[in-house]
Amino acid sequence: MNLIESIRRILKEETEGIDSFINQIDSRYKMSDELKEFITDFIKESDCKKIEFTGFKFQALGLALHDGVLINKLALNRGLDFLLFVIFHEIAHQYQFKKYGDTKMYECYIGDISVDEAAKFMKTTEEVADEYASRKFRELVKKNIINSNFVPPQMYKNVPLSQIRMMVDNYRKEMKSKDITSSEKISEYFYNMVKSEL
C-alpha cells in the first residue's frame, strides 16, 4: 500500500453504527474475530456512512441508500449464511454508489432516462449485487473463515424486466407527485417507506 492509499484509509469516515451492528450479529451467532474483521472491513471499504438493523414495514430484507444501509432485523432469524448474503448484497450497492455516484444510481427515479432504460439499469445493479454478494460469500468459504454448503440465491435473475419496469414507473409517479427531486429526498422517501418504529 502506498502513502496516498494509507492517508486515504486514515481519513475515511467511520461507518456510524458498525460496532453495534457487528455486536448484534455476534451476540446471535458467535462469530470468529476473523469473520467480524472481514465483515467490518468490507463495510468500511464501501464508504458506507451508516448501517443498522431495524424493523421494516414490509418483507424486504435490506435497503441501500446513498447515505447508508438498513437491514431488516428479521434477517437475523434466517441463519448466519443467509444474513451474510443479505449484508453483502446491500453493501455491494454501497460500492455501486461509490463507483457511479448517487445521481447515476437515483436517475431511475428522477432522471431523464426512459422507464425502459431505468428498469434495465435497476435490474443490472440488482443482479450485480447478487453476484458480488455470492463472490464475497465464496471468498469466506475459500479462506476457511466459515464452513458452509450454503448456495447464495440469485434473487433478481428471474424477476421479469416488466415487473421492474412497473415498479420504476410507480416510484417515478409517486416521487413526481411529492416533488422529490434530490438524492436527499429520495433517500428520505425510501427510508420512511420501509422503516418501522416497532
Segments and roles (model prediction):
Residues 85-98:
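Active-site recognition of the HExxH zinc-binding catalytic motif
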Residues 26-47:
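Zn2+-dependent metallopeptidase catalytic core
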Residues 31, 35, 84, 125, ...:
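Hydrophobic (often cysteine-bearing) scaffold residues that line and stabilize catalytic clefts
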Residues 41-70:
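Catalytic zinc-binding patch centered on the HExxH motif and its immediate surroundings
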Residues 81, 97-130:
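Post-HEXXH active-site segment of zinc metalloproteases
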Residues 70-87:
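Short pre-active-site segment immediately N-terminal to the catalytic Zn-binding motif
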